[in-house]
Amino acid sequence: MRIQDQLNHANVNDENMAFYRAIGVDDLTVYPPPFGAPDGLHTRAEMADYLKGVRKQAESHGLRFTNIALGGPDEITMARPERDAKIEEWCDVLRAMGDAGVPTLGYNFKPIGNFRT
């Protein structure tokens, strides 16, 4: 059995990774990574460098960096005019993951949010 937990990109640091390892976490998810936001990373190279850095840091603590989690951009799910640019950015995320050796992506497809009854 393997234990996986997630860290917000703002909390990716040696202290948290050492804690995760100490409590028996094996695999790490970063949710959300700093991609796509106005002040975030946008190019494939920027994203790959970030992911490689997290992977190296995780491995130095005996963790495997196995996953990032993202929400589907509204521009894609709602077929907005900026859709094609967001699809290309999404593809660059996947390419950057491949460049960095991050094997899986978790995502939510919720074009109109959550419903509760």
What are these regions (language model features)?
Residues M1-T117:
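N-terminal pre-domain/capping segments
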